[in-house]
């Protein structure tokens, strides 16, 4: 396609931003290797559908569904989100003065009334064992810092000759949750506390930790402390950081200390938020690589809001066309794919969105997904395919009327003779040599693979 003048300026601006970060827009291919989070993690998180009050039975039901229907397609993580230690957690928000279950060392443990298998000090190990028995991996959410309750009780820190009140920073608090104080990492015993909680969770069999209230604003010392604690356990645990948006200037630090980091605030089923995420995700184009992935947040698809912190029980308010646009962007951007809906409630269409192996291959096998072109409400993304010379192509119309988007293969660095395959429809597309005009409906998208003809 002939890229309009304004779009070329936008593209050059992106190149200038990337150069300032020493991150090439079109970096050389990185060979995928067997490493932790070698491809974007794929899984389920309880937040979008069950908010603060998810139960063991609900987690097990989603794990069973994933094992039966999604594991063959690469989905593997089951993650319990916030407030799992609070017996009286409720829908619709956080309790202002929560009572949290914790052990004698000020470490949070599951609320037995919600997670019965955790009784008698077993923690999440029985639930993690169940998840592992299904061929899946188990994760949990933590808040930055130490429970305020532990500070009030001045509990000892396991493995150190200090107590909670000596390491807490009472001026370092979360703006939206009253559970924790931050840790003053310069004080003796602060690292020991993080070591103790990660050691406990590793003993339960945790494979994934979502650390919250740690990225915006960024708390580098506590991120590094959690990363260090994970390394000490010797267990491969994926570390996810929230909430976003992360700062682009922190990219190297994030790569060194985490496996995924949020690039947006909480993402819900609103077109306005999806439109914004095209910009936020686009900033990080080409940055993801094995071991470290910019994260567009959970996928609010299927049935959500059942007993959530926000909203009511509903099927995703995204239209079917918009739901496909979400999956197309997350796939070509190589964002982690963390499904937010209640899996057993999935309808046929929702299941089709997350079991199309040709689409999922863009996310799992592609590399350096980046915005190639932006003009008005048109967006074009490209990513490098795993096959020599192949590219993935995403076309998006964020506007309110149908648009034609014309692309010429040589502008993508491809020869005129290419096979164009529609990945959603799983069929090759016939058309003139060297070019194609994509007719894209309002809020819609297309996802394709271009392979040089032999």
Language model region names:
Residues 10-22:
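Bacterial N-terminal signal peptides
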Residues 41-46, 76-81, 137-142, 202, ...:
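Structural recognition of the beta-strand scaffold that forms the well-ordered cores
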Residues 67-202, 206-213, 220:
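Aromatic-lined carbohydrate-binding/catalytic grooves of carbohydrate-active enzymes
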Residues 136-151, 216, 231-248:
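Aromatic-lined carbohydrate-recognition surfaces of secreted/lumenal glycan-active proteins
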Residues 166-172, 184-186, 192, 196, ...:
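Glycan-recognition surfaces
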Residues 324, 330-333, 338-340, 374-414:
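Carbohydrate-binding surface patches
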Residues 325-373:
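Catalytic cores of secreted or luminal carbohydrate-active enzymes
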Residues 431-454:
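C-terminal beta-strand-rich structural cap/linker in extracellular carbohydrate-active enzymes
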């Amino acid at each position: 396609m002939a890229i309009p003048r304004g779009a070329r300026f936008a593209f050059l601006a992106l190149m200038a931003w990337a150069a300032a970060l020493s991150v090439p827009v079109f970096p050389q291919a990185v060979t995928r290797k067997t490493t932790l989070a070698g491809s974007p993690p794929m899984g389920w998180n309880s937040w979008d559908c069950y908010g603060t009050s998810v139960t063991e039975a609900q987690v097990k039901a989603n794990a069973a569904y994933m094992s039966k229907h999604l594991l063959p397609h690469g989905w593997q993580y089951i993650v319990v989100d916030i407030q799992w230690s609070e017996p009286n957690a409720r829908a619709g928000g956080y309790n202002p003065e929560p009572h949290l279950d914790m052990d004698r060392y000020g470490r949070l443990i599951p609320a037995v009334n919600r997670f019965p298998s955790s009784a008698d000090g077993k923690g999440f190990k029985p639930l993690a064992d169940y998840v592992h028995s299904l061929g899946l991996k188990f994760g949990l959410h933590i808040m930055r810092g130490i429970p305020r309750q532990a500070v009030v009780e001045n509990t000892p820190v396991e493995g150190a000759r200090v107590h909670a009140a000596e390491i807490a920073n009472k001026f370092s608090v979360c703006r939206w949750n009253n559970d924790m104080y931050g840790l003053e990492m310069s004080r003796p015993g602060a690292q020991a506390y993080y070591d103790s909680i990660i050691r406990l969770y590793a003993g339960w069999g945790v494979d994934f930790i979502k650390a919250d209230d740690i990225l915006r604003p960024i708390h580098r010392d506590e991120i590094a402390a959690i990363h260090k604690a994970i390394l000490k356990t010797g267990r491969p645990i994926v570390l996810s950081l929230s909430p976003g948006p992360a700062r682009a200037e922190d990219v190297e630090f994030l790569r060194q200390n985490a496996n995924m980091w949020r690039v947006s605030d909480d993402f819900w089923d609103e077109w306005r938020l999806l439109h914004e995420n095209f910009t936020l995700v686009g900033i990080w184009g080409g940055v993801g690589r094995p071991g470290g992935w910019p994260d567009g947040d959970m996928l609010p698809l299927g049935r959500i809001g059942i007993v959530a912190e926000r909203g009511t029980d509903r099927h995703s308010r995204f239209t079917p066309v918009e739901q496909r646009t979400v999956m197309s962007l997350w796939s070509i951007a190589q964002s982690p794919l963390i499904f937010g809906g209640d899996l057993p409630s999935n309808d046929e269409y929702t299941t089709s969105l997350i079991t199309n192996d040709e689409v999922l291959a863009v996310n799992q096998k592609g590399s350096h997904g980046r915005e190639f072109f932006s003009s008005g409400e048109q967006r074009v993304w490209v990513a490098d395919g795993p096959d020599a010379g192949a590219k993935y192509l995403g076309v998006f119309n964020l506007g309110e009327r149908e648009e034609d988007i014309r692309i010429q293969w040589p502008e993508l660095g491809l020869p005129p003779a290419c096979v164009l395959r529609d990945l959603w429809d799983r069929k090759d597309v016939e058309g003139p040599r060297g070019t194609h005009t994509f007719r894209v409906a309002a809020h819609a998208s297309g996802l394709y693979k271009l392979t040089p003809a032999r």
